[in-house]
Amino acid sequence: MCAGMVPSAAMAAEAEPAPVPEEELLTASSQSGREIINFNPDWRFNLGDASGAEARNYDDSDWRELDLPHDYSIEQDFTQDVDVNSGALPGGVGWYRKTFVLPADMAGKNISIEFGGVYMDSTTYVNGQLVGNYPYGYSPFAYDITDLVVADGVTENVIAVRVNNQLPSSRWYSGSGIYRNVKMVVTDPVHV
């Protein structure tokens, strides 16, 4: 399970993209016909709502760089303005974005993204298109993104995840954000 991701600030509007060096392409390990890619490294994060952040060409260059898993509640200051059952830490909205290039040999394969846990009420976009909303916080979920990504070794794909933890949301400290591992799973169109 290894990954080599292509970091990117902002994508050029209509420029012809240059080929990405082979060693910088997203790579995966194969297990029984399934390629599992660690999708935790090289995300960008913004605490608070960001209008238009789901767009493919949104400029996230001033966002914080981080690796997942991540909890943005624990990074905030304790406050008496929230219920003590939440650990006296605020929730709120946070955005995550990741830019990646898929190698051409992934074209024609099924590609899904699996989240181990996001607390809570997450909305996921790929290349500006709504993939889905998952309102729960403690169970894993996955989306098939095959028809939304480009696998040509050149094109930058973007995944954006909006997380909204409206407190109170539990009777204990819940944290906020993509707090468990994320992986990409690549399979042949016919697989077990």
Predicted segments, located by residue:
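N-terminal accessory segment at the very beginning of proteins
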Residues: 16, 75-86, 96-98, 103
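Accessory beta-strand-rich segments of carbohydrate-active enzymes
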Residues: 37, 47-49, 91-192
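Short, solvent-exposed beta-strand/turn "edge" segments of beta-rich domains on protein surfaces
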Residues: 32-34, 86-91
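C-terminal segment of classical bacterial N-terminal signal peptides
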Residues: 2-11
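Accessory carbohydrate-binding/adhesion or oligomerization-edge regions at the termini
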Residues: 12-80, 158-164, 178, 184
